[in-house]
Regions:
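A structural signal for alpha-helical segments
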Residues: 4-7, 11, 52, 78, ...
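Amphipathic alpha-helical binding modules
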Residues: 72-105
Length: 105
């Protein structure tokens, strides 16, 4: 059973910020940046999000799953065998999602 998040949009934005920091980092190999940036979204609560944001999250998760579906990774090491192009596509999706859910300044 998962915990209910009081402010799901705030939580999502926090997770997205963390995911982008990981995605943009250069200390880890690309496959590990993908793995850890996706893990930042683990447990994300969609219930309670504004409908537009909810649709954006679902659309981006579908895009990630489409790429992952080529490989069907079961363990962390499986990400290492993914092509650099596919890994970069996932990182781009993560960053695009963060852009979509972050309020304009």
């Amino acid at each position: 059973m998962s915990d209910i998040v009081a402010e799901p949009l705030t939580d999502l934005r926090r997770r997205a910020k963390e995911a982008v920091a990981i995605a943009d980092g250069q200390a880890l190999p690309t496959w590990q940046r993908v793995l850890h940036s996706l893990q930042a979204f683990s447990g994300t609560q969609l219930t309670g999000l504004p409908p537009k944001i909810n649709r954006a999250v679902e659309k981006h998760f579908v895009a990630v799953n489409r790429v992952l579906g080529k490989y069907e990774p079961e363990k962390e090491e499986d990400y290492e065998r993914m092509s650099e192009t596919d890994l970069q596509e996932i990182l781009d999706v993560v960053k695009d999602l963060a852009t979509k859910i972050t309020p304009a300044k």
